[in-house]
């Protein structure tokens, strides 16, 4: 690890927290959470140990904040997709975008994987609640698209939309959890296509190239991002 990230004023609360979290994130990745004392986080952040303790009760609370921030960002993917629907995008493209955005978020934050694995083992880390909230946001988005498509007669009549949405989302999550963070753009696009196609063919009765536009199926969502 190189020298301090930059000295921060003792009273500069928000920037101090950000700098401490940035330092902890780097150190929790390597050498790892168990091998990182608060003093080392403080040194890399360019602040005193007392300053760290002014903002965090202990090392575990720093880990918990990193995990909460990560999961909040993941949860926002579902909210962003719902609020920023492109009326000219096809329904298939909306599903594909969800998969790609979730994949890129994981790649961009791959350095947090070791810290997240540690947090999963801590009952008070808040990881479980944050994970459930993120899953709910993503699943609800998928289900709303599929239910709207059912209203237009585009889905298989023998499929329970809520059950299928949950099962398919779990499949996507399982696939993304094993994603190589060093995946190339070409690999990302290939995986995105495969997961989107699996969703589509499991639920819809028409080929993806005949997918209607969002403005035809999801008019109740349009304009919310304005």
Language model segments and positions:
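Helix-turn-helix
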Residues: 16-19, 23, 27-61, 65
């Amino acid at each position: 690890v190189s020298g301090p990230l930059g000295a921060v004023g003792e009273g500069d609360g928000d920037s101090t927290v950000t700098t401490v979290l940035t330092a902890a994130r780097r150190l929790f990745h390597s050498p790892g959470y168990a091998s990182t004392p608060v003093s080392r986080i403080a040194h890399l952040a360019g602040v005193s140990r007392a300053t760290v303790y002014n903002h965090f009760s202990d090392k575990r609370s720093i880990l918990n904040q990193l995990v909460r921030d990560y999961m909040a960002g993941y949860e926002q993917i579902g909210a962003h997709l719902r609020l920023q629907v492109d009326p000219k995008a096809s329904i298939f493209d909306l599903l594909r975008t969800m998969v790609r955005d979730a994949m890129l978020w994981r790649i961009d934050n791959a350095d947090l994987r070791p810290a997240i694995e540690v947090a999963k083992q801590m009952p008070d880390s808040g990881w479980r609640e944050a994970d459930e909230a993120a899953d709910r946001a993503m699943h609800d988005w998928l289900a709303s698209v599929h239910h709207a498509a059912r209203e237009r007669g585009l889905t298989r009549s023998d499929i329970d939309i809520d059950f299928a949405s949950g099962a398919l989302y779990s499949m996507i999550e399982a696939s993304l959890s094993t994603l190589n963070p060093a995946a190339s753009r070409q690999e990302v696009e290939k995986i995105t296509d495969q997961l989107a196609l699996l969703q589509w063919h499991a639920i819809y009765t028409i080929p993806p190239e005949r997918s209607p536009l969002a403005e035809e199926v999801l008019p109740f969502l349009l304009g919310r991002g304005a």
